[in-house]
């Protein structure tokens, strides 16, 4: 066996670095309601120089529709460094529907012109029945600066009965 090579993990950078929770919050009760202005309902900035080649950034976020007016739609967008890595369908959500998103972003190069590849999914509906999955190549992501991770939500119509609440949000290195 070659020195420094773990046959269980091969070339995985996990051999060199243990996973780390970067951010986690739950129960903030932050809501987006009565507005057609899109809102970053969940947001975290990965610190500058944190990401290394081989890192995997795992993102999980969960929201609940508290109230919905008629046929108004909600569109969730998961973003990494300002780029959409998954855009949910604009759905006529119902009260108590959920929005669940996850993503794995793999760092392939670091520096001022860093590159990454992402696989992400957004599920929306009472049981997460409507699923949108996307693979995205990310370029020009400056890992020497902070990188924002965001869930953006947008209602199609402003109405006092259009309410969505963030329930939990986490970002970790795995």
Range-by-range predicted roles:
Residues 1-2:
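Sec-dependent, cleavable N-terminal signal peptides
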Residues 11-174:
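Surface-exposed molecular-recognition determinants
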Residues 7:
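Phosphate-/polyanion-interacting regions in eukaryotic proteins
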């Amino acid at each position: 066996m070659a020195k420094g090579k773990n046959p269980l993990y091969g070339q995985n950078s996990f051999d060199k670095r243990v996973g780390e929770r970067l951010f986690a919050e739950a129960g903030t009760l932050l809501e987006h309601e009565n507005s057609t202005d899109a809102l970053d309902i969940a947001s975290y900035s990965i610190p500058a120089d944190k990401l290394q080649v081989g890192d995997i950034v795992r993102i999980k976020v969960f929201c609940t529709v508290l109230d919905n007016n008629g046929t108004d739609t909600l569109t969730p967008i998961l973003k990494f460094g300002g780029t959409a890595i998954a855009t949910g369908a604009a759905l006529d959500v119902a009260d108590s529907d959920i929005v669940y998103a996850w993503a794995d972003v793999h760092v392939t190069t670091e520096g001022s012109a860093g590159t990454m590849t992402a696989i992400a999914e957004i599920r929306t509906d009472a049981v997460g029945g409507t699923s949108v999955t996307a693979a995205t190549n990310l370029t020009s992501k400056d890992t020497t600066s902070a990188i924002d991770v965001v869930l953006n939500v947008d209602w199609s119509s402003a109405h006092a009965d259009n309410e969505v609440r963030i329930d939990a949000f986490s970002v970790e290195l795995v």
